[in-house]
Every structure is written in structure tokens, then in C-alpha cells.
Amino acid sequence: MHPTRSFQGLILTLHNYWAEHGCAILQPYDMEVGAGTFHPATTLRSLGPKPWKAAYVQPSRRPKDGRYGENPNRLQHYYQYQVLIKPSPPNLQDLYLGSLKAIGLDPTLHDVRFVEDDWESPTLGAWGLGWECWCDGMEVSQFTYFQQVCGIECSPVAGELTYGLERLAMYVQGVDNVYDLNFNGLEGDEKVTYGDVFLQAEQEYSRYNFEMANTETLHQHFIDAERECEAILKAGSTGENSLHKCVFPAYDQCIKASHVFNLMDARGVISVTERQGYILRVRNLARQCGEAFLLTDAGGFNFKREGE
């Protein structure tokens, strides 16, 4: 299935490429997240000394970006392709360029440029040195060398690649409207477009995000998620369970709090002053989850690097 002819073909090609380069091909995380970075396979696994190589597609939700399905390239629900390699290999840029060639963008035939654009996620307490990749004047992806995640220094540094799948697919298929993307690679009566799959949902979720979401309920959901996250971490913080803190269930609650915050922001009920307060509260949850993760085997608590 050729990547220039279908959205699903593009995804399958990236899966095959990164699998051939040693990445575990994971599944999307089953939570409402604002970006692929929120997947624990990136956020948590970027911490600690243990090597990690993974790639996956992640549905991402940004309620404020909805346009009722009327904008040709702006969506409240979209897909990112995420790659995380720790420690970051010295040839990360070459690997990335190889992936572009695999999906039909030969760097020798196109104007591929890297534009410095350091990345930051305030709610995750994360930042890194990064570059946007522009192809013939349009941004198609970003790669970042993580310096800090959950407020914790990344050692070793992890390399992250993020592809905006819809934008990339529009480019390789040569269409100007995301809803016109060929989704399944077929033609005629059997052809399925991106709009066939997602347009109605985009319209309905835009209405919900901007007009219908109950703000009092959302506020309570945020409080509940915050309390539950801290309670889960506290339950495993002492005694013989000190190395088993139920980090992943706690991190789920952190993700919930972040998404609820984004919904409240879309509804316009958070002032500028309150906004910073909510961000700090989510960041505090992320920090606690990251610190707890480092006390687990997956976080490298008993891991020894070669030569130690």
C-alpha cells in the first residue's frame, strides 16, 4: 500500500521503517491526550537510564483548535506519529531523513530545511532542544532532544520525532483539504476519504467543546483527578511497597486532569491568572509521577549501565 495514495498507507510505511530500525511498534494510548508526548511510552520512558526505542500513532485532542469541520487543515482531533529513542543516536537526523524518503519525500528532490524551534510542554514540565522540519516551505514534522521531562533532567538525553500525519499526508497526496485525503487507497465507490471517517465527529466535538461541555462538571472532574493521582502515589510511598507506587494508574489521572483543563480552556471559563495556576497543578502531578517512576524497575531503579 503506497504511502502517497492513502492515509493508512502512510502510517503502515512509517511502522515498517521504524520497526526495521529497532523500534517496538506500540499501540495508541487509550486516554484523551493533547499530543503524542503524553503517551507514557514517551513521558515516563524518557526518564531514567534504561534504553528505550518505540514508535506509535497517537490520536491527539486539542479542543480549542476545533473549527466545526469548516477549516481545511485545522482540527480538534488529529493524529501524530511519535518516535522515541533513548539514548538519542548520533545519526537521528539521518534516520529521520530516511523516513521521509520511505514515504515518498526524497530529500534530494525537495527543499528540506531544519528550522530551530526549541520545544516546551508547560503542563508536563518538559522542554528540549528542537528543530522543525520544513519541506518546500511547509512544516511537516519536528524533532527534539529532551532535556527535561516532569521537571526531571533526562540522562541520557532521548531523541523524539513527531510527525503531523494529516499535514504530511496532505503534502504527499497533493490535496489542499484534509477531508479530501484518500484514507484507504481505493478509488470509485470503494474509496474512503478522511472526511468520510472524521468530518461528522469533528463537527460534533467542536460544538461540544465550545458550547455544550458542562463547566461545573469539568471543574469537579479536575479536582477528582488531581486528588486521585496524589492518593494513588501516596498509597505506595511507604513500607514494603516503596518500589511499587502504581505509577501508571496515577499518571492516567494526571492525563485526565490535563484534558479537562484543555476543555475548560476551550469553554472560555479560565482567566489568564487561573490558567497559570491550573498548568502548575498539572505540572506538579506530572513531577510526582516522574519521581515515582524513577523508583521502579521500569524507571531504572536497579539498572546498571555498562561498565558500572
From Swiss-Prot:
The superkingdom of the source organism is: Bacteria
Q: Which reaction does it catalyse?
A: tRNA(Gly) + glycine + ATP = glycyl-tRNA(Gly) + AMP + diphosphate
Please state the protein's primary subcellular location: cytoplasm
Q: What EC number is given for this enzyme?
A: 6.1.1.14
Primary enzyme class: ligase
Q: Please give one Pfam family short name.
A: tRNA-synt_2e
Which NCBIfam families is this protein grouped with?
Answer: glyQ, PRK09348.1
Q: How does it assemble?
A: Tetramer of two alpha and two beta subunits.
Q: What name goes with this protein?
A: Glycine--tRNA ligase alpha subunit
Q: Which organism is it from?
A: Brucella abortus (strain 2308)
Task: Name the gene for this chain.
Answer: glyQ
